[in-house]
Design a protein with these regions (language model features):
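Alpha/beta-hydrolase active-site loop
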Residues: 59, 64-89
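Conserved alpha/beta-hydrolase "acid-adjacent" motif
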Residues: 220-228
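Catalytic histidine-centered segment of alpha/beta-hydrolase-like enzymes
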Residues: 249-259
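Active-site nucleophile loop of the alpha/beta-hydrolase fold
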Residues: 123-132
Length: 268
């Protein structure tokens, strides 16, 4: 969906949803659409290949099974590039990439890999240390089993075989997705709150545009470490970093949508 103001400008926000999400799932989208369009900024929200737990994609005359349980993180380059090409065709030349949760990792990864001069700003809603999140919220038995079984199945040529993964709403994830993207030192592992405030992230250090970071003080996914550690880590790694905390907000900004809209309105 593309939301446009009555008087259109050349600026658009591209929203990238999180793990197993969708373009319409987050209830804050309607509020942000109103907030952005009142400022003369358009908003595009779209499904990427990590949408829902399992989904179907029509390629030619054949259906391919995709979804968050099967996606490879690196393929986000194709999804975001498609969205950017779409808005460029509509003559937008100032792009704000906005990610929520796992979408934050994707927009940072895209920015670093593509270095598109049309990208003028990043908005990160609830950026997570994915690997620490797994370690903290999975039982020790499940964590160890996922590590062992995913490696075994990938080696056997069975990356699409499902494993139990209690952090997903459907309780499943494919061996390949976990092995390639959720273990430490994989391509997603560049937000490392677990390493402390002085730890350096090349991917975050390389960002040369302003970054707005927003999360709640009740965000169970971001706050795998103390909130002050998270804030200092981000400030020490991102050159132009504006951090805004919403009191009482969880990872989905439940019942804090208006407050999120106010933060966006005051900081974009």
């Amino acid at each position: 969906i593309i939301y446009e103001p009555e008087t259109r400008t050349n600026t658009i926000v591209i929203e990238v949803h999180g793990l197993c999400g969708s373009f319409y799932e987050n209830r804050f989208i309607d509020i942000l659409a109103k907030t952005y369009t009142k400022k003369g900024i358009s908003l595009l929200t779209f499904n990427n290949r990590g949408t829902n737990f399992v989904a179907e994609l029509l390629q030619g005359n054949e259906f391919k099974v995709i979804g968050g349980c099967h996606e490879r993180f690196k393929d986000c380059l194709l999804d975001i590039e498609g969205a950017i090409n779409f808005v460029k065709e509509k003559n937008y030349d100032e792009i704000i990439l906005q990610g929520h949760s796992y979408g934050c990792n994707k927009v940072i990864y895209y920015y670093n890999n593509k270095k598109d001069e049309f990208i003028k700003k990043l908005v990160l809603l609830g950026p997570c240390d994915i690997q620490e999140e797994c370690k903290k919220y999975l039982s020790e038995e499940e964590y160890d089993n996922l590590k062992t079984e995913s490696a075994k199945l990938v080696k056997e040529g069975k990356p699409r075989q499902m494993l139990n993964f209690s952090l997903n709403g459907n309780g499943k994830i494919s061996a390949g997705t976990y092995y390639y993207d959720f273990l430490p030192n994989t391509e997603t592992d560049f937000i490392r709150y677990r390493e402390g405030v002085n730890s350096k992230s090349k991917e975050l250090n390389n960002i040369k545009v302003p970054v707005l970071v927003v999360f709640g003080d009740m965000d169970e996914c971001v706050l795998t470490q103390d909130i002050e550690i998270v804030k200092e880590y981000l400030k020490n790694n991102i050159k132009e970093c504006n951090i805004q905390i919403i009191k009482g907000a969880d990872h989905s900004f439940t019942d804090k949508y208006e407050e999120l809209g106010e933060v966006i309105n005051n900081n974009i």
